[in-house]
């Protein structure tokens, strides 16, 4: 859990913004959304594999686009 110390004479809005930013960096909301419903291990592996394939395809597309523009 991210912890922030409220500085002297610091407005509440600024402290809240810093807390939200630290929660976002820690990935707490993404973790909560991921754990909201139970996901079977096979489904979890399938989703992870699909995202890896998508990442790889995106990387290849970027590299191919870079090569075609440099002629």
Swiss-Prot record:
The keyword S-adenosyl-L-methionine does not apply. GO terms for cellular component: ribonucleoprotein complex; ribosome. Keywords: Ribonucleoprotein, Ribosomal protein. One of its GO terms (molecular function) is structural constituent of ribosome. It holds the Pfam family Ribosomal_S21. GO terms for biological process: translation. Residues 46-59 have a biased composition (Basic residues). Residues 43-71 are annotated as: Disordered. Residues 60-71 have a biased composition (Basic and acidic residues). The keyword Ribonucleoprotein applies. InterPro entries: Ribosomal_bS21, Ribosomal_bS21_CS, Ribosomal_bS21_sf. PROSITE patterns: RIBOSOMAL_S21. Belongs to the bacterial ribosomal protein bS21 family. This is Small ribosomal subunit protein bS21. It comes from Edwardsiella ictaluri (strain 93-146).
